[in-house]
């Protein structure tokens, strides 16, 4: 199994933690520009972090169904409770974390200069490895792109920033 992702990715971290806990062998590869723009969209229809290529050539994305699939195909202790009530509560917490907590994570990652610098540097070094383009240029491009997507793109403005930080 090859896991394509980014070390800074919220969801890559979730999936890698699961694989390590279950002691499932995998090879991690940074999701470079070619994979991001060409291979992953062709194989999956959209680019998500992480994307997984199985040894038989099939591809998967979206951490929750990937974990469910792996749980069904492997013996051993499960991260998914067998008790229906516990299972429901576990999935509810996971859904909340996946769908709602990543937004504040992105806000704090990209809204403040020191965090933006660090996150932009990590992504520029790992993902956007383009020959001839200095790290500072790649970092700035990523920081601008991510801020537009995950801060202003999520509707954060100067007038509602205080409310966003209070929630």
Give the residues covered by each predicted segment.
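Loop-centered beta-sheet repeat module
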Residues: 154-167
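Mobile beta-alpha loop/short-helix "lid" or hinge segments that flank ligand
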Residues: 139-143
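GST-like domain detector, emphasizing the conserved glutathione-binding G-site
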Residues: 1-136
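Extracellular/secretory-pathway and virion-surface proteins
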Residues: 145-148
């Amino acid at each position: 199994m090859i896991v394509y992702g980014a070390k800074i990715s919220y969801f890559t971290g979730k999936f890698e933690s699961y694989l390590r806990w279950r002691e499932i062998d995998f090879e991690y590869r940074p999701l470079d520009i070619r994979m991001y723009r060409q291979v992953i969209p062709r194989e999956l229809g959209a680019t998500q972090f992480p994307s997984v290529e199985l040894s038989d050539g099939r591809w998967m994305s979206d951490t929750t169904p990937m974990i469910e699939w792996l749980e069904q195909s492997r013996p051993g202790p499960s991260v998914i409770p067998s008790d229906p009530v516990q299972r429901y509560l576990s999935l509810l917490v996971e859904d909340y974390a996946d769908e709602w907590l990543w937004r504040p994570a992105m806000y704090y990652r990209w809204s403040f200069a020191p965090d933006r610098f660090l996150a932009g540097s990590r992504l520029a070094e790992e993902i956007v490895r383009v020959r001839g383009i200095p790290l500072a240029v790649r970092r700035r491009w990523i920081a601008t792109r991510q801020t537009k997507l995950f801060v202003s793109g999520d509707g954060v403005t100067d007038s509602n920033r205080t409310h966003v930080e209070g929630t």
